[in-house]
Regions:
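An N-terminal domain-start capping segment
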Residues: 1-12, 134, 140, 157
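Glycine-rich, flexible loop segments associated with nucleotide phosphate handling
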Residues: 18-26, 49-57, 81-83, 102, ...
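Short, well-ordered strand-loop elements centered on a beta-strand within folded domains, enriched
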Residues: 20, 24, 83-85, 116-121, ...
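Residues embedded in well-ordered secondary-structure elements
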Residues: 75, 98-99, 232
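Non-catalytic protein-protein interaction segments used by genome-maintenance enzymes to assemble
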Residues: 81, 85-152, 156
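Metal-dependent nuclease catalytic regions and adjoining charged, substrate-binding loops involved
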Residues: 140-143, 150-288
Length: 288
């Protein structure tokens, strides 16, 4: 969608043949990213691998793109619509009493519609309903929703009174149904965003408390039968296709001092680098 939206929002007029070529170019970008993440290119994928991964494969994505262009072109070319940014990073304050605490992330899309500012958030699901096309539990999952509420906080901080809502641009991923799309508008009252702020700051306190406990344990952690810091949330182990580290939890009571097992790589994850926060003029604390 990052490649598609700027093209569709341009003032150029496209023939059906040109729109088809745009979809092909977008799927080429998708396929390149697909390969970069360790999967087989759509051009080289055999039937066994395709059946194993279906419906989340490039071929289905291409069919969806054709339908998506037809479904969204009218809105994106409307004179009421203006695309402002694609994947912009953001950093907004979380606590007026702590100038070092920021909520950071990236927004899928930011656009102006009829004078108001919206965040566009792309979501896919396989939760198909014959007369839907989406199941009710998927449609209801965005309010309340910590991620969406966080984006609402961010857009209000960035754009003030012009900020309006998050539009969840939902797409059904299905083997044969390729035209399942819906825009789910999410607005929240300021009191509800304030509740999200309190929840978030509470979780920040929890993480910082655990970090302090871990720091105090120090090198003694290697000799303990379990790690008395950062408690597990075992009710979430199977969410989003399953936690990739669940096998390590089954293997060890305490991961400290263990050799990195085959198939895993130990590396530093930096949200600063991942989100490209340097674009905002920010500096990574590790460089100071």
């Amino acid at each position: 969608m990052d490649a598609l939206w700027p093209i569709l929002c341009s003032p150029d007029k496209f023939t059906n043949c040109e729109l088809s070529s745009i979809a092909d170019a977008a799927i080429d970008a998708f396929d390149a990213n697909w390969v970069e993440n360790g999967f087989t290119s759509m051009k080289d994928m055999g039937p066994d691998e395709a059946n194993r991964l279906t419906p989340r494969i490039p071929g289905v994505a291409l069919e969806m793109l054709y339908e998506y262009i037809e479904a969204r072109t009218k809105m994106l070319l409307s004179t009421d619509f203006e695309l402002l940014a694609v994947e912009p990073p953001f950093a907004v304050p979380l606590d007026p009493d702590d100038e070092t605490l920021f909520y950071v992330g990236r927004l899928d899309k930011v656009f102006k519609y009829r004078g108001k500012i919206y965040v566009g958030e792309h979501k896919t699901t396989t939760a198909y309903k014959k007369d839907g096309p989406f199941r009710a539990n998927f449609l209801d999952s965005f309010s309340p929703n910590a991620q969406i509420d966080g984006y609402l906080h961010a857009v209000h901080m960035l754009y003030g009174e012009k900020a309006k809502a998050v539009w969840v641009d939902a797409a059904l991923v299905h083997k044969t149904v390729h035209d399942g799309f819906s825009i789910i508008p999410v607005e929240r009252k300021f009191a509800q965003i304030d509740a999200w702020l309190w929840d978030t700051r509470r979780w920040v306190d929890v993480v910082e408390t655990e970090a302090k406990i871990y720091e105090d344990i120090g090198q003694k952690a290697d000799n303990l039968p379990y790690l008395p810091a950062y408690p597990k949330n075992t009710n979430s182990c199977m969410d989003y296709g399953g936690c990739p580290y669940s096998s390590l939890c089954k293997m060890w009571g305490n991961p400290e001092g263990q050799d990195c097992p085959s198939g895993f790589v130990e590396e530093r994850w930096s949200p600063f680098d991942e989100l490209k926060l340097s674009e905002l003029g920010m500096k990574d604390a590790k460089d100071e």
